[in-house]
Structures are given as C-alpha cells and as structure tokens.
Amino acid sequence: MHVSLNISIKNVQMLKFTSINKENPSKVESKVRSKNFDEIYANFAKQKAEEQASRCSQCGVPFCQVHCPLHNNIPDWLKLTAENRLEEAYQVSSSTNNMPEICGRICPQDRLCEGNCVIEQSGHGTVTIGSIEKYITDTAWDKGWIKKIKPTINRDQTVGVIGAGPAGLAAAEELRKLGYKITIYDRYDRAGGLLIYGIPNFKLEKEIVTRRTKLLEDSGVEFKLNFNVGEDKTFDELRKIHDAIVIATGVYKSRDINLNEQNFSNVVPALKYLTASNKVGLKDKVEEFDSGLLNANNKNVIVVGGGDTAMDCVRTAVRQGAKTVKCLYRRDKNNMPGSQREVENAIEEGVDFNWLTLPTLYQGNDKLEEVKIVKMELGSPDESGRRKPEIIENSEEILKSDLVIEALGFEPENLPVMFNESSLNVTKWGTLKVDYKNLMTSVDGVFAAGDIVRGASLVVWGIKDGRDVAGHIHQFLNKNIEKNKRVVNE
C-alpha cells in the first residue's frame, strides 16, 4: 500500500557565507540594559534564523561538533533549520543535549563551537551557532513539541541523585528515560544549582530553568529540596533506600587570596553576592541585601578575578546602581579565562578593567576602605603554558573601595566529612576520586559526575558528565540483575 506524506521540504542551498553576512540577534542598548536584569539578547526571527543557518559550510570534518563537549550534531540541525524543518532540528539537537536552550544562552561559544568554525578561520565570520540553538528549543517550547518523559519500561530499581545542578538534572533525565525511579536531593529551596543562584537573570532568566525542572517533575522525577545529606538522612541511609547513588553536588567553596585578615564584612565571595542578587530577583527576602551589605548601590565596587563569574559580578554591580565598578585581573585581556563576549558586554556597560593588576593588601578601620595594588607584566610561560604574571617593582597604587567581591574560582567542599562517609576517596584537589571507566567512586554503587569530579567547569561539561554517568549506572544495575538471577538459579 502506498502512503502519501504531505510534507513540504524546502530545498535550501547551504554554504551561503559568501553572500550572507554574519548577524547576531539584536542586543538591548547598554544604557537601557544596565538598569534592569532582563535578558539582553532577543531571539532570531524565523527568516533570520533560516538565513544565518544557511551560512554553514557543512564541513566534512565539522570542527564545531568536535570542539563541543557534547559533540552536538551542529551541521545537521543548522541544515534542518535552514530548510524550515524546525521540529526535526529540535529532535536532533535534543538527542545529544538535555538543555539546548540553556547552552545556547550561556555557553562560551567563542571558545568552543563558534571559536572553531571553519568559515571564521577564512575571515567570513562564524555561524551564529549558539543563537540558533537557543532559537530552535525556545520555538519547541512555544510550539508544545517538548513532552514529558514516557519510558517504554518502568523498572523497580531506584537511583538517588545528590545535587540538582546541570550534571544531576541531566543524569536524572537520562535515567528516567530508561525507566528508573529517580529522587533528586538538593540543599537549596529550588532545583537548578548555579543555574538558579549563580548565573544572573540577564544571561539566563529563571523561568528557562524552572520549566526544565518542572518537566522532570511531571515526568515522575521526585525532588526533595532543602535536604542536607548527613542531617536529614545519613549517606548510609540513602544507600539503603536506592540501588545506586549519583553525587553531583558541584563545587561551592570559594577560593580567596587570604588578604582579609581583619575579616572586613564588605569583602565577600562571589557566590554569596550573586546568590543574594538572584534571590532578590526571585522575590525572596535577603537580610544582607536589605541591610546594604550585599547591595552595590552607590558604592565603589572592586571585583577581583577574570573568569565568567567575575563578569557576572561586575555586570550585576552595574545593575544594582554602583557608583563605580572596577575589575582587577593579573593577566591581560587576551589571557582572560572567561568568554570574550561577556568581557565586551561588561565594557559596554561601563566596567573599568584594570588589566595586569594584583591586589596585595586590604586596608580600613571597621570596614575595608582601600585596596593596595601592584602592576604586573607577563613573563615566561609556566608549567600550564600560560605566561606567568610578574610584579613590576615600585608600581604600588591605592584604590578606594566600599565593596570587594572575590571571584577567584571554586573548590570542592569536604564531602567525606559533610556526608560522614570516610570511605569516599578524594583526589589531592579535594574532588571525588572515580574510576574513569565507569565513574564509580570508591564506594560500591555510588557514582559521581560534574564539577565534583572534574573541578569547576562549564555547564555543558556538567550535562555531558551527567549523561555519561547515567549510561554507566544503567550498565551497573543491569549487571546486578544478571548477578542476582545467577545466584537464584544456583
């Protein structure tokens, strides 16, 4: 029997990068956006998304895909977008990524997919991969194409996931698809981890995250929030409840430069500052914000650091109405670890960057009032291959400040102590030690994924690790079933 399918497929010629120039979605003017916390980039209009997608050169070896941690099938969904086959584009995109619309917003594409786009290397300007990725999945949400998970089989085994950040959420979704009963435990009152409390609204509006967590909840995943392992239930009790455990707590301990010997209250870690700002945006009452301690309004703010977290802090301070905002970084602009796009946005919004600058002393009476700094120059490369900053003699200066925010990265908390589980082995960096063949920790049936294994990293790496650990847990639980069957038969 012949079945006629009424499908209109637009035959689109790709490789249009020579005739169509690169265009980004429109961005709110800096004077306007610096006064609110709304997302600053608009979505592509349909025609513009199709045009920009058609610029893809459909490389035989797609370096954009190679350099994406998830190895997303980027050329395929670009071609489908150009052909107005958007639902198929979403299906391809979501087959390798649990949160494409989030990655499209916050991934540093200039260091990953777009930074390795072949047509960028030939001077034509990269394909706007991130913006198209965001457009595809935002459209999928609007059109109702994203449905709750309906496993083909429901299994009796349960998996406990400790941590509701990117790695934990990705692992939970993949395991739920396989039919396992999933419970996610998180210390905070909302699921999402740093997606909710660490990343400002102007980069990632919270509704984008909460619709993802609601989708998991609607799909049968149970969330237990305000839950502290070791207090509400012991780690051993969780192991008895579940057939497997995933630890995906992330890394929340802030690094500091040990200059605050006088414990000035107006020297604060980045995450504390950003969490307060995000909670205020969520209409929570935050006493330290209301008192002015974590509010940059009318203050001379100094942020120490050069990564994406530092950029989040300086741009938040601008929006809170800071008098001045300075960013101190010990290397130059070209050697900053964060996204260059975020640096440019911060410059447009009035942030004063002090490159090659190192704070050496915090000074004040009851509160910090001044920061003593020295200027640096880049010397020979160190063991990491980066040029080592060296102090220039007699270059000391004094900067006035009412608030210093230290954005120097994150370290793991002491989980064996927090969980009262001494058999959890850690590395010399404090991250959980795992067998990289299966991501299992030193405790049988307990796996780990995300930053708590690899150290502070990108959301996209957390998603990848969550997907990977889900596959290993599935294998582990299947082997246990087979093992138990053999024991019964014997």
Task: Map each language-model feature to its residues.
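Beta1-alpha1 glycine-rich phosphate/pyrophosphate-binding loop at the start
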Residues: L15-A42, H71-E83, V92-S94, Q121-G130, ...
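A structured beta-alpha segment of the ubiquitous adenosine-cofactor-binding alpha/beta core
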Residues: A45, D218-R239, V286-L293, L356-D402
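A conserved FAD-binding loop/helix module that cradles the flavin
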Residues: C313, I452-L477
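Long hydrophobic segments that form regular secondary structure
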Residues: N298-R331, E397-L403, F410-E411, W429-G430, ...
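Active-site-proximal substrate-binding core of FAD-dependent oxidoreductases
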Residues: M336-S339, H474-E490
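Immediate flanking context of iron-sulfur cluster ligation sites
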Residues: N43-P62, L86-L112
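FAD-site-proximal beta/loop scaffold in flavoenzymes
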Residues: N263-N298, D382-A456
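FAD-binding core/adjacent interface of flavoenzyme oxidoreductases
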Residues: W77, I102-R105, D110-I162, F223-K299, ...
